[in-house]
Amino acid sequence: MYYGFDVGGTKIEFGAFNEQLERVATERVATPTDDYAKLVETIAGLVHKYDAQFGVEGTVGLGIPGMEDADNGCVLTVNVPAAKGKPLRADLETKLGRAVKVENDANCFALSEAWDDELKEAASVMGLILGTGFGGGLVYEGKVFSGRNHVAGEIGHMRLPIDAWFHLGEKAPLLGCGCGNKGCMDNYLSGRGFELLYEHYYGEKKKAIDIITAQKEGESKAVEHVERFMELLAICFANIFTANDPHVVVLGGGLSNYDLIYEEMPKRVPKHLLSVAKCPKIVKAKHGDSGGVRGAAFLNIK
């Protein structure tokens, strides 16, 4: 039995999956955001509860909005203050008497999609999230690749490539990022970035959904903005694909529901790739909000 936990800022979602990778149990509880001991006890309590229910010791995987320090195993996170700087994995392993795996939630999203029936034969899958932020995860041969420092796939904190700056023109905004740097892709390619760029060029705030609606209706500023954004996305995608060369790319997050992306990227990306390279297949995520739990559980698939 595979147990997965999606540990968020307000709730913890638990899921149990059988050997056929079918979900057989679900539970949601509030996240003890400021009480570390209670956080550990809450997770361990759910594990013990479902061990008893299923009569087996399930494997345990956690997806968190952050990552582990590669050297000391302590958690680096903002959204779950109780876990910040704490050895969450080690403490859970001591309490449960079994191995526990912890991964960034974007990596869990990518792993969930990589184990979908239609994609599980793909040698490599890249998950990209176009949501409040822009991030991703890498899966090779069914396993998350997180790198030496657990930051592989943190593409939101790569800076815009030079051709993207040329595309945005002399008035391109140099946006600051929460990581301390400027010009990170996170602030340009996310749903939030889609809105920030519109505000920068046209001097008015609009929600992404309203901009998209206006574009579909032919409103000139929205049409121009979407054209600019699609080319920006293609340039950045091409740089990312050149570095990682994935077989399949899965898009998640709110902006991934914009169907025009799937029409435009296969046409626009190739001209920014090496001449020998082909644009990978780009598809919409199938598992939505359940992806974090699925991916966390599937961290333990051998």
From Swiss-Prot:
Which cysteines share a disulfide bond?
Answer: none
Q: Does the keyword Kinase apply?
A: yes
The metabolic or biological pathway listed in the UniProt record of this protein is: Cell wall biogenesis; peptidoglycan recycling
Q: What GO molecular functions are on record for this protein? A: ATP binding; N-acetylglucosamine kinase activity; zinc ion binding
Q: Which reaction does it catalyse?
A: N-acetyl-D-glucosamine + ATP = N-acetyl-D-glucosamine 6-phosphate + ADP + H(+)
Which residues does Zn(2+) bind? Answer: H157, C177, C179, C184
**Secretion signal, residue range per the UniProt entry:** none
Q: Where does ATP bind?
A: 4-11, 133-140
Q: Which InterPro entries match?
A: ATPase_NBD, N-acetyl-D-glucosamine_kinase, ROK, ROK_cs
| UniProt-listed SUPFAM superfamilies | Actin-like ATPase domain
- Keywords on this record? ATP-binding, Carbohydrate metabolism, Kinase, Metal-binding, Nucleotide-binding, Transferase, Zinc
Tell me which EC number(s) this protein carries.
2.7.1.59
GO annotation, biological process: N-acetylglucosamine metabolic process; peptidoglycan turnover
What functional role does this protein have?
Catalyzes the phosphorylation of N-acetyl-D-glucosamine (GlcNAc) derived from cell-wall degradation, yielding GlcNAc-6-P.
Question: Would you identify the family this protein belongs to, as annotated?
Answer: Belongs to the ROK (NagC/XylR) family. NagK subfamily.
Q: Which PANTHER family match?
A: N-ACETYL-D-GLUCOSAMINE KINASE, ROK (REPRESSOR, ORF, KINASE) FAMILY
Task: Please give the name of this protein.
Answer: N-acetyl-D-glucosamine kinase
Q: Which organism is it from?
A: Vibrio cholerae serotype O1 (strain ATCC 39315 / El Tor Inaba N16961)
Protein's gene: nagK
